[in-house]
Amino acid sequence: MTYFMFLLLMALVVGLVAVASNPTPYFAALGLVVAAGVGCGVLVGHGGSFLSLVLFLIYLGGMLVVFAYSAALAAEPYPEAWGSRSVLGYVLVYLLGVGLVAGFFWGGWYEGSWVVVDGLKEFSVLRGDVSGVAVMYSSGGGMLVICAWVLLLTLLVVLELTRGLSRGALRAV
């Protein structure tokens, strides 16, 4: 399990480097989806299955809006890929920076961070992430509905802004 978590964390770093180093929105959005998926996989590995599912759905909703906006405004006939020299230079600089920071903090930080949420499961009836679900839907239900409406409104505004003068599928908006 430790090796699997190490592999997920390395994939998270690679996904975030892919997002940070790419100037083209198509490939950066793909890196963002990979980074979000791997980050939620790390949460599942630590025992937060419901939290990771909710975060992944929120990430995908937000990334849909961002990707629609960036892809419509920055449509390039020949997008710059990860293999080009400038992007490869950024990738190497970011990986070197991550390696230097990891080398600076390497002394034992990983030993205490692998504790899962079920470490004290004999004292609890429910899992750690499930006990917060009732509070989220009872006390935070209104905020959840407001956030869903804001995401929908943002999607419609982005689609309206990127439509321009062409008469697309959203003629009534």
Swiss-Prot record:
Its EC number is 7.1.1.2. It comes from the Eukaryota. GO terms for molecular function: NADH dehydrogenase (ubiquinone) activity. It holds the Pfam family Oxidored_q3. It is a multi-pass membrane protein. It catalyses: a ubiquinone + NADH + 5 H(+)(in) = a ubiquinol + NAD(+) + 4 H(+)(out). Gene3D superfamilies: NADH-ubiquinone/plastoquinone oxidoreductase chain 6, subunit NuoJ. The keyword Transmembrane applies. It is found in: Mitochondrion membrane. Keywords: Electron transport, Membrane, Mitochondrion, NAD, Respiratory chain, Translocase, Transmembrane, Transmembrane helix, Transport, Ubiquinone. The chain crosses the membrane at residues 1-21, 25-45, 53-73, 87-107, 141-161. GO terms for cellular component: mitochondrial membrane. Its main location: mitochondrion. InterPro entries: ComplexI_Subunit6, NADH_UbQ/plastoQ_OxRdtase_su6, Nuo/plastoQ_OxRdtase_6_NuoJ. Belongs to the complex I subunit 6 family. Core subunit of the mitochondrial membrane respiratory chain NADH dehydrogenase (Complex I) that is believed to belong to the minimal assembly required for catalysis. Complex I functions in the transfer of electrons from NADH to the respiratory chain. The immediate electron acceptor for the enzyme is believed to be ubiquinone. PANTHER family: NADH UBIQUINONE OXIDOREDUCTASE SUBUNIT ND6, NADH-UBIQUINONE OXIDOREDUCTASE CHAIN 6. This is NADH-ubiquinone oxidoreductase chain 6. The lineage of its organism: Eukaryota, Metazoa, Chordata, Craniata, Vertebrata. The gene is MT-ND6.
